Amino acid sequence: MEDKTVELQFITHFTDTYSYYDSARMALEGGCRWIQLRMKDTPVDEVEREAIRLQGLCKDYGATFVIDDHVELVKKIHADGVHLGKKDMPVAEARGILGKEFIIGGTANTFDDVKMHYKAGADYIGCGPFRFTTTKKDLSPVLGLEGYRSIILQMKEANIHLPIVAIGGITLEDIPSIMETGITGIALSGTILRAKDPVAETKRIMNL
């Protein structure tokens, strides 16, 4: 990584302590410049209200704003892009709706997933989980460092060049060894929000 700076994606999470908006604001204050709004099992009108607020906040910080799952909402409010989970709309279908101007990320757990998203026109891959995480239901098999090394190696052999972002149960201490596998960046949520000072924790991560 240039300047040894971690490319950090922050995924919003509603907790007893922080709202979606507060969680994003703290990550932005700490230097993160990529926010994904993730509101599973929430009516789309509520997601839209939160998305519009967060979109304005991200613009203030010059940050990329991506919404999980809601392709039509991304197009409606002109967010920067969408992240699609394994049970969400296929990447190719989303690309057909959004065209080339929007960012589309796909979720992968295997090299075959990566290859499928690459052929479908994904801009980046969220790859995981690194380990068990309590912030997500229906986890795919845990990858660990060896899983990432294997996927990165197979990508090189197949001449597939696509940013790969590690996700799932990652702690600050894990990040250096994960980055050494050839991973492009890290996606975090609970690790930051469980810290005593989420802003300071984000700064520490950004400066690893």
Swiss-Prot record:
The keyword Metal-binding applies. It catalyses: 2-[(2R,5Z)-2-carboxy-4-methylthiazol-5(2H)-ylidene]ethyl phosphate + 4-amino-2-methyl-5-(diphosphooxymethyl)pyrimidine + 2 H(+) = thiamine phosphate + CO2 + diphosphate; 2-(2-carboxy-4-methylthiazol-5-yl)ethyl phosphate + 4-amino-2-methyl-5-(diphosphooxymethyl)pyrimidine + 2 H(+) = thiamine phosphate + CO2 + diphosphate; 4-methyl-5-(2-phosphooxyethyl)-thiazole + 4-amino-2-methyl-5-(diphosphooxymethyl)pyrimidine + H(+) = thiamine phosphate + diphosphate. The keyword Nucleotidyltransferase does not apply. Keywords: Magnesium, Metal-binding, Thiamine biosynthesis, Transferase. Pathway: Cofactor biosynthesis; thiamine diphosphate biosynthesis; thiamine phosphate from 4-amino-2-methyl-5-diphosphomethylpyrimidine and 4-methyl-5-(2-phosphoethyl)-thiazole: step 1/1. It holds the Pfam family TMP-TENI. 2-[(2R,5Z)-2-carboxy-4-methylthiazol-5(2H)-ylidene]ethyl phosphate binds at T133, T134, T135, G169. Its EC number is 2.5.1.3. Binds 1 Mg(2+) ion per subunit. InterPro entries: Aldolase_TIM, ThiamineP_synth_sf, ThiamineP_synth_TenI, TMP_synthase. Mg(2+) binds at D69, D88. 4-amino-2-methyl-5-(diphosphooxymethyl)pyrimidine binds at Q36, L37, R38, M39, K40, D68, T107, K136. GO terms for cellular component: cytoplasm. GO terms for biological process: thiamine biosynthetic process; thiamine diphosphate biosynthetic process. GO terms for molecular function: magnesium ion binding; thiamine-phosphate diphosphorylase activity. Its cofactor is Mg(2+). Belongs to the thiamine-phosphate synthase family. PANTHER family: THIAMINE-PHOSPHATE PYROPHOSPHORYLASE, THIAMINE-PHOSPHATE SYNTHASE. HAMAP family: TMP_synthase. Condenses 4-methyl-5-(beta-hydroxyethyl)thiazole monophosphate (THZ-P) and 2-methyl-4-amino-5-hydroxymethyl pyrimidine pyrophosphate (HMP-PP) to form thiamine monophosphate (TMP). This is Thiamine-phosphate synthase. It comes from Phocaeicola vulgatus (strain ATCC 8482 / DSM 1447 / JCM 5826 / CCUG 4940 / NBRC 14291 / NCTC 11154) (Bacteroides vulgatus). The gene is thiE.
